């Protein structure tokens, strides 16, 4: 997971810039709608909704917008939120890099067409369901900041049924667990006074394709940026790592 986390750190820097875009507000609002639709519209009893709300607040989405999204998901605003569905698309990027795209859409034909164009114009191709998902494992991830003592983090992580952790930056760690144990892990870490900046479910590549050429990196990152810019796309995950010199070239 080391290389993936290295790139994930750059992605988080990029997210600070992307968070200023209206499309990110739309994505986070849709995540709240789906979470409220799939469970009860009360964050205290709906972990998926609670984490979606936390992400929205971290991005600066006003409380009124959050409450409206919850109401849409609960069906109390008479909206068409019931037409939204979660779909995972799969494909390949330049150099055979495997790519997973998670979308929320009210028109799967439109979304598939948009994705197909994005892939084909940027050196990739949209594949069939299952063509690359076997290369990834879904994990729960807690991002912890202000880690001053790794032994304390390890102890708390074990109590919370974590599988592993990794220091990805100075005093910043990612703690991994089974998806079913994510709520327990996050609650345990908080109870031990660790600061969690994000709690999420993430696709983790089992193996990675090393990107060592700048031209391939440019094509791949252009494809990912294009995919992430589509209105229906919630997240994009790929099984690549980059050489340090290339990462520095694209750092913000």
Which sequence ranges carry the predicted segments?
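Positively charged, low-complexity, intrinsically disordered RNA-binding extensions
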Residues: 143-252
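N-terminal cationic and glycine-rich segments that engage phosphates or anionic surfaces
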Residues: 1-127, 132-141, 252
């Amino acid at each position: 997971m080391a290389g993936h986390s290295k790139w994930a750190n750059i992605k988080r820097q990029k997210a600070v810039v992307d968070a200023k875009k209206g499309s990110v507000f739309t994505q986070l609002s849709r995540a709240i709608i789906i979470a409220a639709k799939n469970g009860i519209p009360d964050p205290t009893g709906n972990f998926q909704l609670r984490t979606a709300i936390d992400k929205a607040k971290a991005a600066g989405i006003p409380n009124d917008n959050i409450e409206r999204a919850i109401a849409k998901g609960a069906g109390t605003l008479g909206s068409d939120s019931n037409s939204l569905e979660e779909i995972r698309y799969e494909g390949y990027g330049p150099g055979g890099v495997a790519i997973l795209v998670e979308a929320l859409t009210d028109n799967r034909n439109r979304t598939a067409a948009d994705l197909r164009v994005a892939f084909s114009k940027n050196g990739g191709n949209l594949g069939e369901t299952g063509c690359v998902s076997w290369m990834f494992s879904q994990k729960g991830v807690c991002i912890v900041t202000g880690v001053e003592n790794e032994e304390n983090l390890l102890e708390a992580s074990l109590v919370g049924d974590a599988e592993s952790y990794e220091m990805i930056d100075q005093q910043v760690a990612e703690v991994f667990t089974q998806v079913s144990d994510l709520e327990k892990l996050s609650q345990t870490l908080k109870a031990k006074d660790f600061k969690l900046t994000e709690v999420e479910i993430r696709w983790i590549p089992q193996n990675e394709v090393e990107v060592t050429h700048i031209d391939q990196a440019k094509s791949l990152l252009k494809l990912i940026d294009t995919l992430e810019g589509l209105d229906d796309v919630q997240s994009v995950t790929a099984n690549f790592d980059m050489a340090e010199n290339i990462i520095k070239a694209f750092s913000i």
